[in-house]
From Swiss-Prot:
Family recorded in the similarity comment: Belongs to the class-II aminoacyl-tRNA synthetase family.
Record keyword Protein biosynthesis present: yes
Taxonomy, superkingdom: Bacteria
Cell compartments where the protein resides: Cytoplasm
UniProt signal peptide: none
InterPro entries with a match to the protein in the record: aa-tRNA-synth_II/BPL/LPL (IPR045864), Gly-tRNA-synth_heterodimer (IPR006194), Gly-tRNA_ligase_asu (IPR002310)
Species name: Oceanobacillus iheyensis (strain DSM 14371 / CIP 107618 / JCM 11309 / KCTC 3954 / HTE831)
The protein's name in its UniProt record: Glycine--tRNA ligase alpha subunit
Length: 293
């Protein structure tokens, strides 16, 4: 099964279980959790079920396309269900079966790994899902998002597409994975992988990036003051990616790093509060729609 078939299989599976199929969010981010389709929509009482593929940029993991297992950009298949269904583990195992992985024939373990994202003020109870000794999914019940209590509890499933494909296709080098009809990850992503690594570690203008961080931070604050949640959150994502570029280049000290993370977290918390307040003013419309049904 190639990657394109894997994605279609997961989309069909979760669509059958009432998930909206969304597209990737069009701003750089380090994880699918950072999409507003997860971070903001997990807040408040309104129900929300969604699934989407998210390209995730981790500048510090860039290796010029030379490492068989580490990538500047990898792909996650993200599933969010709020409130969490009682049979979520069964639904997940069923999705593996549809990918050709029979749980009765493999060693599938849920290894406790409580999750935290300090930058977003987010945390939860969670497990890594290991398939025959390799992590393929992160399974998390959100307890806190944007510094706010998650109520009702949202469950997040994050499949590592490349890791899962490495197992299914029995490949040791991620660049040998087939995306579709003989086209490999190397064909599609090797050049951007090499060039983004070169930019991150050698060519980025650090003075400009420091200035951009401050500009994005200020714009996020000003936009929040206008009550414009989603544009403000876009600038928080830009702050996060800019910080990741600076951090990967090693130009931020340990002390400064803590301060930058706190600045991003404070923005995320403020936006989260405004988002819930704005939805409350609207009468939590998706909650009303569910009640009407």
């Amino acid at each position: 099964m190639n990657i394109q078939e894997m994605i279609l299989t997961l989309q069909n599976h979760w669509s059958e279980h009432n998930c909206i199929l969304m597209q990737a969010y069009d701003t750089e981010k380090g994880a699918g959790t950072m999409s507003p389709m997860t971070l903001l929509r997990s807040l408040g009482p309104e129900p929300w079920n969604v699934a989407y593929v998210e390209p995730s940029r981790r500048p510090d993991d860039g290796r010029y396309g030379e490492n068989p297992n580490r990538l500047y950009q990898h792909h996650q298949f993200q599933v969010i269900m709020k409130p969490s269904p009682d049979n979520i583990q069964e639904l997940y195992l069923e999705s593996l079966k549809k990918l050709g992985i029979n749980p009765l024939e493999h060693d599938i373990r849920f290894v406790e790994d409580n999750w935290e994202n300090p930058t977003l003020g987010a945390a939860g109870l969670g497990w890594e899902v290991w398939l025959d000794g390799m992590e393929i999914t992160q399974f998390t019940y959100f307890q806190q998002i944007g510094g706010l209590e998650a109520n009702p509890v949202t469950v997040e499933l994050t499949y590592g597409i490349e890791r899962l494909a490495s197992y299914i296709q029995d490949k040791e080098n991620v660049f040998d994975l087939e995306w579709n009809n003989g086209v490999t990850i190397r064909d599609i992503f090797y050049q951007p992988e090499y060039e983004h690594s070169t930019y991150t570690f050698k060519e980025s203008n650090t003075d400009m990036l420091f200035d951009l961080f401050s500009m994005y931070e200020q714009e996020a604050k000003q936009t929040m003051e206008k009550g414009l949640v989603f544009p403000a959150y876009d600038y928080v994502l830009k702050c996060s990616h800019t910080f990741n570029l600076l951090d990967a280049k090693g130009v931020i000290s340990v002390t400064e790093r803590t301060g930058y993370i706190a600045r991003i977290r404070n923005l995320a918390r403020s936006i989260s509060k405004i988002y819930v307040s704005e939805r409350e003013k609207l009468g939590f419309p998706m909650l009303q729609e569910k009640g009407a049904k």
